[in-house]
């Protein structure tokens, strides 16, 4: 079975609009074009399809095969290329819960479309991603519901007669689906191996994919906290795979901003080295639309063809205690910036028409009731005012912590240097303790034009001179090659 190495996603972190649409905000129809584009032009082998919000298109398989038939005859959906659905978590997103059932119910319909097109038995959709996974039951419920109700309904008889549903409208395939848990908070990531071990017990699995978030943990626990959580999870999943004999293929949800993963065409080698043990990396919108096309294609080819290195051992006991200390300092600083972040967030342009999935952050008790927008908007707001969020929390680290970070987070200085290209040292909102400690980590060399723009944005927002704020935010994002 081919496992994709790159997963294109619909994260709206891009500044520029893709060439195949005139819409500033991508619509559902645009996202069908986008799926074809990332397969055919960029070389991604997987597209994540977000099944939440009013603009969602449940007929994406039919549209792809009917509109781009020649391409998909040569590149088989479900064998060579993959479409993976991200569904609502009914435990968290109650108003979206029924969409989960609709989405699961659409999988056999998509199978029928592909079967008619290819005349074989490859399912075009056979994996789904469950966000905000926190327990074994949350992923097992989906697996069992699909087997018992979506597939099981075909054996029911109608009105007490001999006619089964399968005899009436045809058989239902595929017989089973694979559920990819997406772990987004500290407790989930630290329990990922335990949750999967339990999930493995009553199933005959030849492999398991698992998705580790990178953006939401950064917003919740800071840059270093997020990286260390990913590394602990990668190491524990490696041990789980060795112990059970079931290959585990981790996915890292990396964006272009250093705070959200620092995955760009020019950083693919160091990011894959940083996250040793990761099999698949997400290709988000800034990577696709804010970079040089040839460089993006070359970088994706590298990601698809590279040799996978095993996860590295990490002292998780010390790492967890460090994360708690660091996160406390980070959260204190971001709480103080929350009013400004929310003010700037109002001017961050939207890049997708649909309602995006909800996040864990914003009603988290450890943030003292402070409400913040989603990770991309938080990142965009802070960069726009010249305070890269990567610097927050550094002052909470001891000297031993710093040595541990330098040893286990290989490219921390490079990530901080990349981020601080967009630092405005003159910002009146930059915490004094950060100004004091930053020179111990890196040499600060801010981008002159971005520094001026961030100062103008800060001044305009604080003075409520809002006419040109969004334009300046877009100009600053264009310099960075990512919005947030």
UniProtKB/Swiss-Prot annotation:
Give the family per the record: Belongs to the PEPCase type 2 family.
Catalytic activity, as annotated: oxaloacetate + phosphate = phosphoenolpyruvate + hydrogencarbonate
GO MF terms listed in the record are: magnesium ion binding; phosphoenolpyruvate carboxylase activity
Which sequence ranges form a coiled-coil region, renumbered to this chain? Answer: none
Subunit text: Homotetramer.
Does Lyase appear among the keywords? yes
The cofactor(s) it depends on are: Mg(2+)
Q: Which GO terms describe its biological process?
A: carbon fixation; oxaloacetate metabolic process; tricarboxylic acid cycle
Give the InterPro entries listed for this entry: PEP_COase_arc-type, Pyrv/PenolPyrv_kinase-like_dom
This protein is called Phosphoenolpyruvate carboxylase
**EC number of this enzyme:** 4.1.1.31
Q: Which UniProt keywords apply?
A: Carbon dioxide fixation, Lyase, Magnesium
- Gene name in the database record: ppcA
Q: Does the keyword Lyase apply?
A: yes
Which major enzyme category is it?
A: lyase
Main function: Catalyzes the irreversible beta-carboxylation of phosphoenolpyruvate (PEP) to form oxaloacetate (OAA), a four-carbon dicarboxylic acid source for the tricarboxylic acid cycle.
């Amino acid at each position: 079975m081919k496992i994709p190495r790159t997963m294109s996603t619909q994260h709206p972190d891009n500044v520029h609009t893709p060439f195949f649409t005139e819409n500033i905000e991508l619509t559902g129809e645009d996202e069908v074009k986008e799926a074809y584009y990332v397969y055919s032009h960029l070389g991604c082998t997987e597209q994540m399809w977000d099944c939440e919000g009013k603009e969602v298109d449940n007929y994406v398989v039919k549209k792809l095969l009917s509109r781009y038939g020649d391409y998909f005859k040569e590149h088989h959906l479900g064998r060579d290329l993959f479409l993976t659905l991200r569904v609502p978590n009914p435990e968290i997103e109650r108003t979206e819960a029924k969409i989960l059932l609709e989405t699961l119910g659409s999988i056999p319909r998509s199978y029928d479309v592909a079967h008619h097109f290819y005349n074989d038995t490859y399912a075009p959709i056979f994996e789904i991603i469950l966000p905000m996974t926190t327990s074994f039951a949350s992923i097992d419920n989906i697996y069992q519901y699909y087997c018992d109700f979506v597939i099981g309904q075909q054996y029911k008889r109608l009105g007490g007669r001999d006619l089964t549903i399968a005899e009436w409208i045809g058989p239902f395939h595929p017989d089973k689906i694979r559920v990819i848990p997406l772990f987004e908070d500290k407790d989930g990531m630290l329990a990922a191996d335990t949750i999967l071990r339990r999930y493995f017990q009553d199933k005959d699995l030849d492999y398991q994919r698992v998705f580790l978030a990178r953006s939401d943990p950064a917003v919740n626990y800071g840059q270093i906290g997020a990286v260390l959580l990913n590394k602990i999870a990668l190491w524990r999943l490696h041990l789980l795979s060795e112990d059970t004999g079931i290959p585990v293929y981790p996915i890292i949800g990396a964006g272009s901003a250093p705070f959200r993963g620092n995955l760009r065409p020019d950083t693919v080698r160091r990011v894959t080295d940083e996250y040793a043990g990761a099999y698949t990396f997400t290709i988000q919108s800034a990577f696709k639309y804010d970079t040089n096309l040839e460089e993006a294609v070359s970088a994706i080819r590298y990601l698809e063809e590279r040799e996978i290195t095993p996860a590295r051992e990490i002292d998780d006991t010390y790492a967890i205690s460090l994360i708690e200390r660091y996160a406390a300092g980070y959260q204190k600083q971001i709480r103080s910036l929350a009013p400004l972040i929310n003010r700037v967030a109002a001017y961050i342009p939207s890049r997708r028409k649909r309602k995006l999935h909800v996040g864990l952050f914003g009603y988290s008790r450890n943030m003292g009731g402070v409400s913040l927008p989603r990770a991309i908007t938080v990142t965009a707001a802070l960069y726009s005012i010249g305070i890269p969020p990567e610097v927050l929390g550094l002052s909470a680290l001891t000297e031993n912590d710093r040595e541990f970070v330098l040893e286990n987070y290989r490219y921390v200085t490079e990530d901080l240097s990349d981020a601080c290209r967009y630092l405005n040292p003159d910002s009146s909102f930059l915490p004094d303790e950060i100004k004091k400690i930053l020179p111990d980590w890196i040499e600060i060399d801010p981008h002159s034009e971005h520094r001026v723009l961030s100062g103008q944005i800060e001044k305009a927002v604080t003075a409520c001179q809002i006419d040109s704020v969004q334009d300046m935010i877009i100009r600053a994002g264009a310099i960075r090659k990512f919005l947030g």
